[in-house]
């Protein structure tokens, strides 16, 4: 069901799996709300900064490690509207960047017509969690879909305690065999919204 390339891939110790369409929508909502609140234009989110913030929230620390970033998106969408860089094929897929947290390798994965979006997300998550090499998984699903959240909880129930799994959501979720972080903090950082502006 999943792209054969993913099954054969050598996975890094650290993997970020994100529903790119959902993350883009949340970024848009934050831009609209905070522009009104703080009275200034907010630029597109910095993709590298957002990935760094997710990695830090997921427990990554400075070092020379490698992290794979899998952006799952609708086949109909060629780019994210509220991020820079944003084009899945020309600017993100197969690209990498390095900083004090190591190297980040980005893959964009369009949802094929033969599979439902939630099923594909769950398949990728389950496959990544089965890999012995993977030690840390950061998951950004569309948490507005209750059935998907239940299925993620079920999928992660049997994951080895040696793996550190963090699920990012806009509000706290019902607990499970994973840590939780609030997605909004990493997005606000990537959008350049400073804490002092919110006072």
Where are these regions (language model features)?
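Eukaryote-biased recognition of electropositive, low-complexity segments
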Residues: 155-157, 162-199
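Structural motif
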Residues: 19-20, 141-144, 170
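A charged nuclease-like catalytic/ligand-binding cleft shared by nucleic-acid processing domains
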Residues: 11-25, 36-138, 177, 183-197
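Acidic, polar low-complexity linker/tail segments
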Residues: 1-13
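A short beta-strand-to-loop transition that corresponds to the Sensor-1 phosphate-sensing loop
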Residues: 72-76, 143, 171
């Amino acid at each position: 069901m999943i792209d054969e390339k993913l099954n054969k891939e050598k996975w890094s110790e650290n993997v970020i799996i994100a529903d790119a369409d959902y993350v883009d929508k949340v970024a848009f909502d934050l831009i609209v709300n905070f522009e009104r609140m703080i009275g200034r234009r907010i630029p597109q989110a910095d993709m590298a900064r957002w990935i760094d913030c997710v990695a830090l929230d997921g427990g990554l620390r400075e070092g020379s490690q490698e992290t794979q970033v899998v952006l799952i998106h609708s086949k109909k969408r060629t780019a994210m509207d509220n991020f820079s860089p944003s084009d899945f094929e020309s600017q993100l897929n197969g690209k990498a960047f390095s900083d004090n947290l190591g190297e980040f390798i980005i893959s964009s994965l369009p949802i094929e017509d033969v599979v439902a979006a939630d099923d594909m997300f769950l398949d990728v998550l389950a496959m990544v969690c089965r890999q012995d090499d993977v030690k840390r998984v950061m998951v950004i699903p569309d948490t507005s879909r209750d059935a998907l959240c239940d299925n993620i909880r079920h999928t992660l129930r049997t994951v080895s305690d040696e793996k550190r799994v963090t699920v990012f959501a806009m509000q706290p979720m019902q607990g499970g065999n994973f840590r939780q972080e609030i997605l909004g903090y990493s997005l606000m950082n990537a959008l350049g919204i400073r804490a002092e502006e919110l006072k």
